[in-house]
Amino acid sequence: MKNLCLVLVAITATSLTLNAQNAASDAEAKAAAEATVRSFVDSWNRADGASYGENYWPDAELVNPSGEIVDGRAAIAQEHVDLWAGIFKGSRMAAKVRKVQRLDPNHIIVDFDTELSNVRELPPGNQNQGKNVLRTHLKHVLEKRNGQWKVLSAQNTFIAGK
């Protein structure tokens, strides 16, 4: 009976430890997601290509709302520099995290919505969502390397007008 009690105590202690670790992991995932989205918004609103690109790993991939695949941090940053020189010059971004899902200790999925205001021209494939406004859903897979969270893969999709 004494051995059974010791086993039950050990199982309970292990369970409590795992629950505490999961809670800490979930908090870390949420903090990483929020920090990444804040960095995207800040760098967008400054039209800062280098800072924007730093959110991505060098081997990252982005699928833009038009379905084009952009490979690598440098190409992703340059695509945004080009956008800020064109139809998104002077635009302002606001964003809200909708969902954070931890896949494993080093990978999370972040779903968030953006709204761009002061858009000069709506891109092809986008429905009118109001005067000079563009809304998108983004899904980013963040990967943790050497203690840093950055985007490994991203999908950006226009929100259909209502």
Task: Set out the residue ranges of the language-model regions.
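Sec/Tat signal peptide C-region and signal peptidase I cleavage site
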Residues: 16-20
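A beta-strand edge to alpha-helix "cap/lid" segment located at domain peripheries
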Residues: 21-48, 54, 61-162
